[in-house]
């Protein structure tokens, strides 16, 4: 959409200005507060590789093994399950199994608004005893999310119904969403995300950094955003650890202890 086109232009302009002045982008945005940005593992259900028959992630045991593999390789201490694939009862069992396998670590669940309202209530109440970072878009729309707030005692997050300032104002009035997931493309660039984070801090909402399926260039925008936000309270999302290569020079950026150094 048009906002995402603005983001691409902003990224390029910030890069040009930084190169001209000889400074990193985070210096143009107020200066970094952290050298590394922590990330959560992103757990997807998967088909098996048709060539090898390996890599399937469908069962509880397969998902736990996949989560352990990612933790061992990258050092993640927060874990996100992308749901909305199987019946809620199966995904609930999978989610609880990962939490049990990663004691004391953060958990988050995102079914992309696929749950019915009743299923969202049941799922949310069934995981209240876990260490949940947040419950992301279990139902779709500000009004349903606000209704869910009355039944679930977990922070509710979104990257779908609060992605511009008009929606942010509506959320300020309804208090449907606790955690606004800032996406550098959805919001039209890094600077709008910083402005939105300031509004959220003023109004008592929390923020995190969202992933929309990035390569290295957009990942760099996420890292510079994460570096400068004083009210960043959660590990960022990223699809990045699922990539086998990247378009940037030197290959993919590396995780160290579940985090990536700000370039």
Task: Please report, for each region that a protein language model flagged, where it lies by residue.
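Shared catalytic-loop signature of beta/alpha-barrel
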Residues: 125, 131, 140-157, 162-261
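N-terminal capping/lid subdomain adjacent to the active-site entrance of alpha/beta enzymes
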Residues: 1-107, 112-121, 125-129, 246-263
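A cross-family glycoside hydrolase active-site/sugar-binding cleft signature
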Residues: 40-42, 80-82, 108-112, 136-138, ...
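Short low-complexity stretches enriched in small and charged residues
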Residues: 66, 111-113, 133-138, 217
